[in-house]
């Protein structure tokens, strides 16, 4: 024999009250979620890359580059360096202005062709840039909002400068590398 409710069938008012309680709980959860989540994307804060740069320059077997001086309105937001079995890696990233553009610098003396193929898989050659008498390969990403890159292999290391800016702006950045 099946158990039966002592109250019998719920009335229409009971159903409305139950739905109202559930709607209130869902609304409270949504309100808390919206208050805790900032609708504006937060840009990364600036980082001081000088200590990492000093270590990399002392430890690595190739000239580790960084811009000197950093252009006005540019801020370093990422730095990464690692000594790995495959080679020494140096990365430095900058946001420009309000963060709508970036420029990144990558260097390694590891497996150069493999690193290049991995980092620039969706890029196609677009010619060359000559900067202070040095030739850099121009590459353009195959994307709706393509990155551009300047690439150079020298002294057993590859240097990749890429970003969402024009080739001319990338060239100006390269001129600042020391």
Descriptions of predicted regions:
Residues 16-19, 25-26, 32, 70, ...:
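Generic hydrophobic secondary-structure signal
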Residues 47-145:
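Short, solvent-exposed recognition patches
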